[in-house]
Regions:
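Conserved active-site and SAM-binding loop architecture
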Residues: 1-145
């Protein structure tokens, strides 16, 4: 996601070494998207226009937010799905979250530079992971029956 995400597009123009990495990342993403397997779930932040074009303009199937799954934060995450249903929100806390100051609800956007910043920004929220596990496993069990 480092080279495909909308938040990183500005770095393409300041560091020319990122362009080949972006091409490689888009190629890898496209190969995953078109893999000959029965089910696919790819999670990635919102893509920039160059990456979207390189993967063939395929739009995500769903855009989710942590606040849809019980976390008082905003961080858009896209899902590309094959033979899996869109996730159903499990605990929407958007109204409560919107009462927080912007720098709290968009905490990840305001993180200062640090060695761990990338790791903090790429955290998978437990509520989202739980929804994926329970909802998609149930779908698989239903189709196996």
């Amino acid at each position: 996601c480092t080279y495909l995400t909308n938040s990183g597009v500005c770095h393409l123009h300041t560091d020319p070494k990122r362009w080949p990495k972006m091409f490689d990342g888009a190629d890898f993403f496209k190969r995953l998207l078109n893999a000959p397997v029965p089910r696919i779930a790819i999670e990635n932040p919102i893509m920039h226009g160059y990456a979207k074009k390189l993967i063939g303009g395929v739009q995500q199937d769903q855009l989710i937010q942590p606040y849809m799954f019980g976390h008082m934060e905003q961080k858009a995450t896209c899902l590309w799905l094959k033979n899996l249903p869109n996730l159903t929100p499990t605990n929407v806390v958007k109204d409560e979250m919107m009462l927080l100051p912007k720098n709290k609800r968009e905490r990840l956007h305001y993180l200062p530079p640090s060695p761990d910043r990338w790791k903090l920004r790429s955290t998978t929220y437990q509520g989202i992971a739980d929804a994926m596990a329970s909802q998609w496993v149930n779908k698989l069990l239903e189709s196996a029956a």
